[in-house]
Every structure is written in C-alpha cells, then in structure tokens.
A protein has these predicted regions:
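Acidic beta-strand-loop-alpha-helix segment within the catalytic core
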Residues: 1-68, 117-138
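Oxyanion/phosphate-interacting regions
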Residues: 49-54, 69-138
C-alpha cells in the first residue's frame, strides 16, 4: 500500500495494484473529531497539563507518515506531532494538500520547515487546535 499525489488537487492510495482517489473527511466537525497525536517525550508533563482539552481528544497513536496518510484518506481528522524532522513531513505535504488537508507548525508557520506539526482535515478544526496548542507552541 502506498500514497501519491497526481497533481496539487488529486491524491491516491494504491493497494494491491488498485488506485483509489483519496480525500480528507470534509464533513467532520470539532464535536466528533478523530485525533492521532504523540509527544514522544518532547512535551513535559508540566507542559501537557497546559493542554488538557487536547489530551482528552487524543484517540489514536501517531506514527508520522502513516498517520498523515490516514488523515489524507479521511480515517482521522487531525494529527498532532512534535519535533518532526524534514524527512518526516516533506514527503507527505503534497499528498495531504492534494487530499484537501491543512498543515502548519503549532504556531501556524510553514510546515515544510519541520518542527511541531499540526495537520487537519479542514480550516475550522485546524484553527481550533492552533488555539488549544497555543500554551505550548512557543
């Protein structure tokens, strides 16, 4: 199984030789958001206490490119990662964008520079998580 973007507006998953167009979940609201997140020891317990709403929403483990790919497929609606390297995020940026997703750092900077990354299925969810992550985004 692998993921690819055909253009800046079209992304696919190829599984067992069959290509299927993918898209983020465009109908999701914050009320029923599915979140994959991991802090990998980067975010201390004291810092985690500053974002209790984010912690309560975490439902799925996070695995860099796989979690970002699941968002592009519509399986999860937000992915929150810390201390990503360029090689963690660069390959998936065109796929997520082509599937309709939003990417940035936690302080709303360009995700292509790596760092603490937020990927969301729509702008409303993205902005809500940026606000919730603000206490730890510096």
């Amino acid at each position: 199984k692998y993921y690819l973007n055909y253009s800046d507006k079209t992304a696919y998953v190829v599984d067992k030789g069959k290509r299927k167009k993918i898209s983020v979940n465009k109908k999701v609201s914050f009320k029923n958001v599915k979140v994959a997140a991991a802090f990998h020891g980067w975010l201390s317990l004291d810092k985690q206490k500053k974002i209790p709403k984010v912690l309560k929403l975490m439902q799925f483990p996070c695995s860099d490119a796989l979690s970002y790919s699941h968002l592009a497929e519509g399986r999860v609606d937000a992915v929150i990662q810390c201390s990503n390297k360029i090689w963690d995020i660069h390959p998936i940026i065109p796929i997520v964008k082509a599937a309709g997703g939003y990417l940035s750092t936690w302080n709303n900077k360009d995700a292509s520079n790596a760092g603490n990354i937020l990927v969301s299925s729509n702008k409303t969810i993205h902005n809500k998580f940026l606000k919730l992550l603000k206490p730890v985004s510096k």
